[in-house]
Swiss-Prot record:
One of its GO terms (cellular component) is host cell cytoplasm. Belongs to the RxLR effector family. This is Secreted RxLR effector protein 144. Its main location: secreted. Keywords: Host cytoplasm, Host nucleus, Secreted, Signal, Virulence. It comes from Plasmopara viticola. The lineage of its organism: Eukaryota, Sar, Stramenopiles, Oomycota, Peronosporales.
Amino acid sequence: MRPWLLLLVGLSSFFALSTSVNRAKNSGSDFDLESRASTTNVHSILSKRKLRAFGGDTNTLKDSGKARREEKVWKLFCSVFLQLDDKKKCMFETNQVSSHQPEPRPALSFMPGPKPAHSLVPESKPVRSLMTGNAPVRSIATELKLVLPRITETVKNPSKSQVVMLWLHKVADFSKSEHGVNTMAYRTLYEWLSPSFSDAKLAKFFVGLREDEALRETAEKMLAYMLIKSTSTEAVGRAWLKSGEHPSRLFESMNFKEADFKDTVFLGWLKYAS
C-alpha cells in the first residue's frame, strides 16, 4: 500500500475517534444537566417510587426479600447518583428512626449540712392550714406528732428540737394573724403545758424564748397570761429577775387595766419594780 494511502487511513481513524469522544462528552454534559435538574424533583420522585414499590399498594409487595433489595438499590441510587450529603433523606419513612434525643435528667445534688427548716415539717393538710392561719395549734401539734415527751425535751433544751421550735414559730405567726386574734394561741400553749410543768420551769422556758426575735412578743404574752393564771407570782418574779427585763417593758406587755391595779399580778409587778 502506498504511504499516502496509509496516512489517509490514519487521519480518517483519528478524526473518527475524536468525533466519538466529543459526542460522548457532550452527551455526558447533557446527562449531568438532566440529573442536576432532576434533583429539584427528587423528593417527589422518591415519594412516587416509595409509594409504588413499598407503601402505596400492599398487594404488589409479595416478597420481603425483594423489598429489601429494592430498598438497598434505591439508597445506593440516592447516595451515589444524586450524591446527597445526608443519606437519611433517602430513608423511607417507615424505617426512619427518630433523631430526637431525650433531655438528660438534672443531676441530683446532695447538699451537705442541715436541711432547711421547711423540710422538717411534713406536707400535710393541717400544716398547710396553719401556714395560712386557719388551723388550731393543738391540731397542728397532733399532726406533727408533737407528743408530750417531745415537748418536754424541748422545754428542757429548746435547741435540740427544730420541729418543735418551728411549730412555736407557727404559733407566733398564727397568734398575730387575723384568724388567731380570737383563739389566743399562746394561751392554748400555756394551758397545754401547765399540767406537766411547774410554773418555775415554764417561766424559765418562756423567758428563754424571748431571745428569739420571732418569738419575743408571743413569749411575753405567754408570760403575762401565765402570771394571771398562776397561783403564785414568785416563779414569774424570779424569771423576770433572771432576765433583767425593765419594769416598764413588763408593764407594757402585761397590758394592765385600772381594774387590775388591786390584783395580785399588779402587786407582783410592783414588788418587782421596786
